[in-house]
UniProtKB/Swiss-Prot annotation:
This is Adenylate kinase. The gene is adkA. It comes from Thermococcus gammatolerans (strain DSM 15229 / JCM 11827 / EJ3). It catalyses: AMP + ATP = 2 ADP. Belongs to the archaeal adenylate kinase family. NCBIfam families: PRK04040.1 (NF003122). The lineage of its organism: Archaea, Methanobacteriati, Methanobacteriota, Thermococci, Thermococcales.
Amino acid sequence: MPFVVMITGIPGVGKSTITRLALKRTAINFRLVNFGDLMFEEAVKQGLVKHRDEMRKLDPMVQKQLQLRAAQRIVEIARDEPVLLDTHATIRTPMGYLLGFPKEVIETIRPNFIVIIEATPSEILGRRLRDLKRDRDVETEEQIQRHQDLNRAAAISYAMHSDALIKIIENHEDKGLEEAVNELVQVLNLAVREYD
């Protein structure tokens, strides 16, 4: 049976770092799939964008078509090996927040778990300011908190349409990265029984 763990969190929360470290410690090998990469590859093929950060500025209907194509690819991969799906639950666009997974997309993927990585708005803002490699929109702490609140609401909606369990992992500066990584490893190790 396919085993898919979605891992989400807003930009700057530390999601990619936690994911990379957790995958080194799991009892079974996961295929790390970045949902945005799958969408970006398709958008480049269609000549819609040249840079990944342009994706959120695409027309919402175009984004939804790209999402459905990516979901179909995830299902194909998960038939053979467990998937850790690195993604965003919601995407901030100039017109408002776009759900990362409309109903038909989440029903296609049907993840087993939805893991949300969170931190305080001030921690996220500080991390974003230190990461100059990415072209990110500037947000206030209030906007960052709103985005995290919307991610929780989106995760509940996704769970309703996929029967997934929701796990919230906090990645605070004082808590330590190690604890957040260990929490994710515990979730990922549940896949062992599915691929024995």
